[in-house]
Regions:
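Conserved tyrosine-mediated DNA breakage-rejoining catalytic core shared by Y-recombinases
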Residues: 13-72
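Helix-turn-helix DNA-binding elements, focusing on the entry/boundary residues of the two helices
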Residues: 8, 142, 154
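Short pre-functional
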Residues: 1-9, 31-33, 135
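Active-site/catalytic core of tyrosine-dependent DNA strand-transfer enzymes
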Residues: 48-119
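Catalytic-site neighborhood detector that most strongly recognizes the C-terminal catalytic loop/helix
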Residues: 149, 153-173
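Alpha-helix N-cap/helix-start motif at helix boundaries, enriched for small hydrophobics
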Residues: 5, 9-14, 145
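Short, basic (Lys/Arg/His-rich) helix/loop patches that form interaction surfaces
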Residues: 95-147, 166
Length: 174
């Protein structure tokens, strides 16, 4: 998948030092070592595409790539309104970026798919994490999703197994 299901707090806390190369199974892989709730660390594999995006984000800020910046450099920042390239995003800044993106997509869908537009306008940063969990649980074992999301209990992950209203309606109508 292209997403990692990170919490908002993990996204804004993420630093270049979190990007590592580690042995996973029989090969070396790039990963992000996420510092989650309770300062627990979990390791999630990164694709070359994801590494390229992170590298490009740093370069767009006028910094070197992943290999050329101090380890405590935030992975993401808001450069609008005088933002500084070495200052990380705030929770409010992340929310505004995500909400702005959803709003621009909702505007495009307004006439052709008004219900989808309304859903996007109501979406939040946590909705992205929720979407990751729901999608991941259709493809992966619940224990893998639990570990990826940093849940202490499989019952927390299990909450995402509840069918969406639309999915249940479609299934029962068959």
């Amino acid at each position: 998948g292209k997403t990692l299901g990170l919490r908002s707090s993990e996204i804004i806390d993420a630093r270049v030092s979190w990007i590592v190369t580690r042995r996973m199974g029989f090969r070396e892989r790039a990963a992000i070592e996420v510092v989650g709730k309770g300062s627990k660390v979990r390791r999630l594999p990164l694709t070359s595409e994801q590494l390229g995006i992170l590298d490009g984000c740093l370069k767009a800020r006028g910094l070197g790539g992943l290999q050329a910046v101090p380890p405590e450099t935030p992975l993401l920042t808001n450069l609008g309104r005088g933002g500084k390239p070495f200052e990380g995003l705030t929770r409010g800044g992340l929310y505004r970026i995500v909400a702005g993106f959803f709003e621009s997509v909702a505007l495009d869908l307004e006439t052709s798919r008004p219900l989808d537009a309304a859903r996007l306008r109501a979406a939040s940063t946590h909705w992205l994490r929720h979407s990751f969990a729901v999608e991941a649980l259709t493809k992966m074992n619940v224990n893998i999703v639990q570990a990826a999301m940093g849940h202490a209990s499989v019952s927390t992950t299990g909450r995402y197994l509840a069918p969406e209203e639309e999915e249940m309606s479609d299934a029962l109508a068959r």
